[in-house]
């Protein structure tokens, strides 16, 4: 009965057993504090901060996707790319297929944690769902969507060709460009003279 109780405490990370020494109570730690919710996206700076997080994670995900992708992953990536192109043609904002493309990159890693993180974050990671178009796309919405599409095509091509370095570079460029567009939009918005 005592062994069973100790096993449960170990599984819960409440105690640690050191063979030949004994069992020790571990210090309590706060494991559930990390959250990114819509409440965390109240300013352009918040959106930029999440983009910086995405740059670090999704750059590596793209490299892993290039290394590990399957033919089925390629089909799913191509379908998401086509759905985004179709959305542009009908003057849609393209958020669902944009997110789907990034989700398919995550799936192509073969690492469920990338997919779980993308699922957790959801479409709120797409900057144009958090800020107005003038801020995220100072060059105009249609031109902006075409730029994104071109960047997605570069990511897809690198993953298809299993070029790990090119996939990382393409994803880093894509997300860094989004960050820079937001910074420029923010600066242009804050420097406008009052009427």
Question: Where are the predicted features?
Answer:
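Short linear motifs at protein or domain termini
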Residues: 1-57, 63, 67, 188-195
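C-terminal flanking helix
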Residues: 10, 179, 183-186
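Conserved amphipathic alpha-helical segments that form helical-bundle/coiled-coil interaction surfaces
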Residues: 50, 54-133, 151-157, 166-180
């Amino acid at each position: 009965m005592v062994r069973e109780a100790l096993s449960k405490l170990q599984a819960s990370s409440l105690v640690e057993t050191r063979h030949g020494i004994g069992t020790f109570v571990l210090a309590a730690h706060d494991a559930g504090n990390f959250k990114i919710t819509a409440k965390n996206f109240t300013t352009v700076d918040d959106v930029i901060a999440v983009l910086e997080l995405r740059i670090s994670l999704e750059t590596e995900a793209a490299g892993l996707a290039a290394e590990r992708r399957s033919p089925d992953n390629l089909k799913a990536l191509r379908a998401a790319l086509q759905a985004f192109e179709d959305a542009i043609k009908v003057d849609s904002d393209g958020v669902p297929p944009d997110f789907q493309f990034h989700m398919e990159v995550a799936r192509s890693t073969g690492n469920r944690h990338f997919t779980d993180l993308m699922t957790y974050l959801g479409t709120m990671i797409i900057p144009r769902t958090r800020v107005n178009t003038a801020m995220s796309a100072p060059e105009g919405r249609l031109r902006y969507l075409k730029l994104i599409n071109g960047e997605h095509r570069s990511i897809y091509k690198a993953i298809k060709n299993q070029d790990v370095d090119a996939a990382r570079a393409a994803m880093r460029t894509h997300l860094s460009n989004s960050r820079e567009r937001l910074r420029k939009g923010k600066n242009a918005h804050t420097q406008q003279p009052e009427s």
